[in-house]
Regions:
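Charge-dense, intrinsically disordered terminal/linker segments
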Residues: 44, 91-92, 101-106, 118, ...
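Post-HExxH zinc-binding segment in Zn-dependent metallohydrolases
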Residues: 94-133
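Pan-zinc metallopeptidase signature
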Residues: 139-171
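Long amphipathic alpha-helical segments with strong coiled-coil/leucine-zipper propensity
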Residues: 65-72
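Soluble non-cytosolic domains of exported or imported proteins
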Residues: 73-78, 82, 96-97
């Protein structure tokens, strides 16, 4: 992507639990191509995605991460946490286990980002609000996925997902 903010966000993932995601975005993934990241009206893909913050998408052998344009002015640290989540999705299959893992990764990365870049905690940003909610769930569960998992399983957007998916083995 040529959006400067995504380059900044990727740099912020260095040395965090999201480094795997950073490498996946740079091309170390199932497709062997870099992931294309862009802001996009998600309702153009599917009306059901209109309110989503972001989606990971695979199309014609390439991976994409589309981020809701409402986050265009989010701090790069919050975008970094979001990217660490979306880069987990590398195939056409999704599951509750994969989402639980991705949301937990996002919460852990956000916690790490705040330690390194406290200025990321800009409370004006809707994305920062999301990240802080995830961080609270992580802390409430004593740094396990206990409460994040409950939140994922209760999410309307995931109600038709299977428990597991072929490309994802839950640790």
């Amino acid at each position: 992507s040529d959006e400067q903010i995504f380059h900044v966000a990727l740099d912020m993932l260095k040395g965090t639990s999201g480094d795997f995601s950073r490498k996946a975005i740079l091309g170390y993934n199932v497709t062997q191509y870099p992931v294309k990241i862009m802001f996009k009206d998600l309702s153009e893909i599917n009306e059901a995605y209109a309110t989503f913050d972001a989606i990971g998408w695979k199309k014609r052998g390439h991976l994409y991460i589309y981020i809701n344009p409402k986050h265009e002015y989010a701090p790069p640290g919050a975008l970094a946490a979001l990217l660490s989540h979306e880069a987990i999705h590398q195939d056409e299959y999704n599951s509750l286990s994969e989402e639980t893992y991705a949301w937990t990764m996002e919460a852990v990365v956000w916690t790490e980002i705040l330690k390194k870049y406290p200025e990321s905690n800009n409370l004006e940003s809707a994305l920062v609000t999301r990240e802080n909610i995830l961080k609270q769930l992580l802390e409430k569960g004593n740094y396990t996925n206990k409460y994040i998992k409950k939140t994922v399983y209760a999410n309307e957007g995931y109600k038709n997902l299977p428990l597991t998916s072929p490309g994802f083995i839950n640790q």
